[in-house]
């Protein structure tokens, strides 16, 4: 039984019902429908913290999905899982791959900035201020890109950029 049919969360059930209706009425190929089913099941597993299952579904969705825009969201969600698992290098790779396919994902830029900022803080704790500054500069660049895409969002990042004099 597909995960979407056993999910107990009301919002997930509602999403699944709407998604199934849309899949029936919007003209799509069977491959696209199957890719979306895996993507949907991946999101469901991810929301429940079942990251291994989510990754399996996302990888299968990637195998089937041909649209670069849709692939960008699959890659982004894989990046989220790696971030949650503390696998920051892998997460950065997947966010970057998502942005290659869809450069209008401010949340990917934001997450990349958060990882870089975190690494900057780690470098400070290790006493390496030069490396820390490099990480902070990279975080600033990613936050600037996120803010450029959605100027009203990322207020804390905007404040950090101003306080650290990295905002132009």
From Swiss-Prot:
Pfam families: TPR_1 (PF00515)
Swiss-Prot/TrEMBL TPR repeat ranges: 35-68, 72-105, 120-153
Subcellular location: Plastid, Chloroplast thylakoid membrane
The entry's keywords: Chloroplast, Membrane, Photosynthesis, Plastid, Repeat, Thylakoid, TPR repeat
Membrane-spanning segments: none
Domain of life from the UniProt record: Eukaryota
Membrane topology term: Peripheral membrane protein
UniProt KW NAD keyword: no
Keyword Mitochondrion applies: no
Gene Ontology CC annotations of this record: chloroplast thylakoid membrane
Signal peptide start and end residues: none
Stored InterPro entries: PSI_Ycf3_assembly (IPR022818), TPR-like_helical_dom_sf (IPR011990), TPR_rpt (IPR019734), Ycf3/AcsC/BcsC/TPR_MFPF (IPR051685)
An annotated GO BP: photosynthesis
PANTHER family assigned to the protein according to its UniProt record, in alphabetical order: CELLULOSE SYNTHASE OPERON PROTEIN C (PTHR44943), TPR REPEAT-CONTAINING PROTEIN MJ0263 (PTHR44943:SF8)
Role this protein plays: Essential for the assembly of the photosystem I (PSI) complex. May act as a chaperone-like factor to guide the assembly of the PSI subunits.
NCBIfam families: PRK02603.1
Family under the similarity heading: Belongs to the Ycf3 family.
Annotated protein name in UniProt: Photosystem I assembly protein Ycf3
Native organism: Gossypium hirsutum
Species lineage: Eukaryota, Viridiplantae, Streptophyta, Embryophyta, Tracheophyta
Encoding gene, per UniProt annotation: ycf3
């Amino acid at each position: 039984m597909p995960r979407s049919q056993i999910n107990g969360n009301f919002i997930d059930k509602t999403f699944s019902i709407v998604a199934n209706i849309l899949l029936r009425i919007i003209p799509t190929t069977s491959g696209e429908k199957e890719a979306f089913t895996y993507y949907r099941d991946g999101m469901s597993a991810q929301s429940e913290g079942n990251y291994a299952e989510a990754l399996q579904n996302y990888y299968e969705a990637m195998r089937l999905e041909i649209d670069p825009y849709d692939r960008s969201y699959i890659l982004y969600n894989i990046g989220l899982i790696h971030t949650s698992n503390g696998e920051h290098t892998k997460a950065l790779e997947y966010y970057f791959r998502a942005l290659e396919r869809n450069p209008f994902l401010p949340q990917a830029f934001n997450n990349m900035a958060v990882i870089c900022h975190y690494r900057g803080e780690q470098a400070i704790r290790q006493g390496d201020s030069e490396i820390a500054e490099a990480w902070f500069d990279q975080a600033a660049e990613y936050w600037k890109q996120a803010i450029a895409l959605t100027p009203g969002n990322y207020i804390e990042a905007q404040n950090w950029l101003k306080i650290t004099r990295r905002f132009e």
